[in-house]
Structure formats: structure tokens, C-alpha cells
Amino acid sequence: MAMGTCAVTASAADGDKYTIGICQLVQHEALDAATQGFKDEVTKELGEDAVTFDEQNAQGDSNTCSTIINSFVSNNVDLILANATTALQACAAATTDIPILGTSVTDYATALEISDWSGTTGRNISGTSDLAPLDQQEDMLVELYPDAKHVAILYCSAEANSKYQATEFEKYLDEDGISYKEFTASDSNDIGSVVQSATEYADVIYIPTDNTMAQNTEAINNIALPAGTPIIAGEEGICKGCGVATLSISYYDIGKKAGEMAYDILVNGADITTMKIETAPNVTKEYN
């Protein structure tokens, strides 16, 4: 079943069949969990026979994201799931008609360059955010390392959502009088030298939710662990790979929530232009 508007008035019980395109930026634990949560929920709500998923992975390349999304648009899929910010931005540029749900996107206003933010995009885009409580993550850092004087904030400069988290996290460090410095890698090739510099500066490293860092936790751990520099992570996948602790959302849960939103759009005819961005219902402390 194809569609050219933002809302559908149909019922899966009437035998309608839907095609959903899924563009995942890259393969790593967090994004994989979000995609799985989405598929599980949509399949549960619609039934296996009522939905076909065209699932594509862009292998971390923005141009590949655009190619994938353009193929979805050409095939006139009923809805697109954009898993990660780069995928969402490619969708936003490709279509104003097909409903787009984002997931694993931290800040939609930043990603879509919306200056007057009210919780909805006002266009054919909604979804779920992976923004964790940054104030509580900073509290965790202080609780675990009360003598820390210098914090390195490590992220990829190409990821706008990571910069947003870093800026917000720094506000809480300022409140506690803790010095900090940003250490940014432009891509995976820079990570080794950047992490080495971070360990030389910091008592503790903080890594926000960041796809490039999530892909390279082994390389990060191989430098930070021998240096004796602990890492507080923004999400559980990074924590498992190189961190000491995190206060993390469940990526499976935000994918599942996006699946609920998809059902509401496809079957109940919900107007995506007025659907608020949803957040994770719970956060969990995890230690490694």
C-alpha cells in the first residue's frame, strides 16, 4: 500500500499491507536495538503478513543514506524509519510527503535546524529522542570521581547531536567548578591520537551518545585503559565497550515507541505534523 500524504485512514484488519523503509546509519549495538524494537512493535501491532520492511544500512556514509532514502521515495513506501541523525536529515531533504519517524536522534531542533522549537516539527517528521538526563550523568561522574579536576569530553565533530550534548554537559560541570576540554575526532581515523591527548589532560573522560565513538570503543579502550583514565559513557553500548559507568536509556524502548507511533499514523490516521517527539520512559544505571 503506497501513500502520498502524511496521514492514512486505514485499518490493518481490513487486509491492508504496508511497506516501511528503514535507513540505519551504521551498525552498532544501540542503533541495532532501536531498529529491532521498532520492527517488533510494528509486527506485533500489524501482524507479520501486513508489513514488509525494506531495511538498509548506510555503513556510516551520508551519501549512502541519501541514496537509500531516494530509493524509498521512488518506491513510494508508506513510512520511513530514520535511525540516527544523518539518516533523518537525508529523509528531510528527500520528501515532504511520506511520513518520517526518527529514532536514536538526540535533538530534533538541532538536526532539522528549527529555531522556534515547540516539541513538534510541523511537517512530515516526528519520532523518538535518545537524549539521556545529562545532569544526572554529570552527577554520576562527580559521585564516582569526587576528586576529578579535569574532564575530557570526547566526541565526533561531524555529529551535531554530540556537540549539543557536550555543550549541555559543560553547563553542569561549570556549576560544580570542574575544568573541562573538548577533544573531537573528525572521523574514525583521528580517534587514536585524540583519545591519547584526552588521557593526558583528564582525570575522567565523558563520551556522549555518538555513533563514531560507538563504532570504535575497542580502539578507545586500548588507549584509555592502560592510561588509567576512566570513562563515563552516554549510553550502554559505549559503556560496555570502553566505559566504567553510564546512566542510559534503552534504545530498544525508543525504537518500540517509534513503532507505536508508526501504527498510530498508518492505521489510526494520526497527523504526524502535530505528533510530539517522544523520549525514553526510563533510564538505568549500568556499570562495567
Predicted region positions:
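Flexible loop/turn connectors
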Residues: G237-Y287
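Hydrophobic alpha-helical segments within soluble ligand-binding/sensing domains
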Residues: D14, Y108-K149, I249-A270
